[in-house]
């Protein structure tokens, strides 16, 4: 089997998903109507609610949902074979993941841009709302803590990525000011700034920045120094108006990823490498069973509950008109899925273009690939870029830089979402300080830092990461449940939401229960307790939601 047929099949399905299935959802299920004002136009506070061109907003949404998830997850999951990973990434995206993101986005704009936690309260009561918001808050803190550590680790491992990763920030501020205040030609600016960013990647490859001497002079490890820098940046980035940094940075990053994806796929078409991984491998050494763990290992690229936080947290507050939700919510997810597909191609075929034994070396066991997944992606992707004439070492710098950029984008979007959640909790409990964006951002950063520092070396978030995959997908199931409740309330067809909702809740509840049992058997009472509490919260929210369905008439 070679890579080209897989690429062709996948993109035919993506095209069907966007041009046919998302159109059906938009017109027949949600009945999008551009005459209905969006929250961005109704509120338009110039800070969080800002009507935005759909392609710029797509850039923000795409880069915020992407992060490292669709890279690491598929890179690990192909240990069970390329076929299960391929089917879940492509079919899952078309019929579940894209539906989930689109549903969360539309449901939020129909509720004044409120988060899915607040929307749940309207249907299932205040108690369910508060518990769900607390669950969302805990997941956001975990994402921030883990991504801060992972980005810092990447900066240390790939010092060539430091310069281009930080160069994008001042450039994005200048870009945003030029577009929104000076009204400079958008296309000309885009070409100029992209050229500067790619030159920055070249400079990074020839002038890597090692912060070890500075860190040691401050009595810190390089990783801890970067963690402090990242959270300082996130504090300001999450508090500033979205047009100042968030939108232009994410638009520029999104274009960089789009260009990289195009080059990767051109390289794959030119080289058409042979897939050296087995189609199916049910018993890899040390791996958990493929069912249900495939569905939570690939936690992005096929489906991700974190996307509901982005859709209802930042993107819904910037949507200019309802019809834009198809491009932002659904097409944005197809973009992420295409990245996950590129990772599958890179790790199962690109990795072996110059060494047939490389795949077996990296995928010899579950523990081996869990510690080497990014190596597999960077090396395999660089080989594919080599097919279009890009030197392999420079290709590694490009890929490592973009992994860092998207992880950082996800992190500061997550801090902003955490600020929104804290603000909502402040309104519920009358804590007015939390409704101040700067105060809420400070609390968000401090709580995430507290988790980081709870374990030596900044690894505090990694302690809880084993439960994230299942918890993230449970959140996706609950977000679909909220979309179902909305459609039920307005008397619209619910089957396209109900079927994926039942599937996701069943699969991920089973995985969470198995994780809880395994942790109990290993004597890890902390992770067992966390898993058990999340399962109880899920059952309570589902129970309260269906009680609400029974007692609330449609209108």
UniProtKB/Swiss-Prot annotation:
Q: Which family does it belong to?
A: Belongs to the peptide transporter carbon starvation (CstA) (TC 2.A.114) family.
Origin organism of this chain? Aquifex aeolicus (strain VF5)
Biological-process GO terms, alphabetical:
cellular response to nutrient levels; cellular response to starvation; peptide transport; protein transport
- In terms of superkingdom, the source organism counts as Bacteria
* InterPro entries the UniProt entry points to: CstA (IPR051605), CstA_N (IPR003706)
Where is this protein chiefly located? Answer: membrane
Q: Which UniProt keywords apply?
A: Cell membrane, Membrane, Peptide transport, Protein transport, Transmembrane, Transmembrane helix, Transport
Q: What is this protein called?
A: Peptide transporter CstA
- One Pfam short name: CstA
**TM regions (residue ranges):** 1-21, 55-75, 76-96, 131-151, 160-180, 186-206, 225-245, 251-271, 290-310, 327-347, 388-408, 433-453, 462-482, 494-514, 523-543
What job does this protein perform? Involved in peptide utilization.
- Topology with regard to the membrane? Multi-pass membrane protein
Q: Which GO terms describe its cellular component?
A: plasma membrane
Highest classification ranks of the organism = Bacteria, Pseudomonadati, Aquificota, Aquificia, Aquificales
Q: Where in the cell is it found?
A: Cell membrane
